[in-house]
């Protein structure tokens, strides 16, 4: 999904180098390099124990709180909030193996992700994963820069530990 963001600046750099000058190429090459970095997919070694949860995203844990979840789990649960900066990989992985038995896309705003309350205001996509050991709800929330949510899975899909299922 990131290829157009990388290829377009590279093509523009070639055109700028040909029609303008070499100095016009530099910002376009830097932009292509940044998009290559942004859309990267680092390899991860997943645990073999299906009881273990892995982080669904690279980033920084900025909050852990008890909440009453009423869309999928319908119970009190622990909510873990992970903030992705512009330097983090924006791919999302299944935190445990299981079957997707809930899916919900919600249109919304594109406020900065670090602002309080954006989890309920911004565009978001949630999947519920049913495993042999537990159920879990994972939500991807768009922000002011990462504004597009892409999902590669649908209801009924079986996910493996750490399998890619989407990106912001």
Regions found by a protein language model. Give the residues of each.
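Contiguous, well-folded functional domains in the mature portion of proteins
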Residues: 1-168
């Amino acid at each position: 999904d990131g290829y157009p963001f990388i290829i377009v600046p590279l093509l523009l750099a070639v055109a700028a180098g040909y029609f303008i000058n070499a100095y016009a190429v530099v910002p376009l090459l830097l932009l292509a390099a940044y998009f290559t970095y942004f859309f990267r997919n680092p390899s991860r070694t997943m645990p073999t124990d299906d009881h273990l949860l892995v982080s669904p995203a690279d980033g920084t844990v900025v909050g852990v709180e008890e909440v009453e979840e009423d869309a999928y789990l319908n119970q009190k649960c622990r909510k873990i909030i992970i903030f992705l900066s512009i330097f983090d990989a924006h791919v999302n992985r299944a935190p445990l193996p299981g079957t997707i038995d809930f899916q919900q896309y919600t249109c919304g705003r594109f406020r900065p992700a670090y602002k309080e309350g954006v989890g309920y205001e911004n565009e978001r996509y949630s999947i519920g994963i049913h495993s042999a050991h537990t159920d879990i709800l994972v939500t991807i929330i768009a922000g002011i820069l990462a504004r597009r949510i892409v999902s590669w899975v649908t209801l009924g899909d079986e996910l493996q530990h750490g399998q890619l299922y989407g990106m912001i």
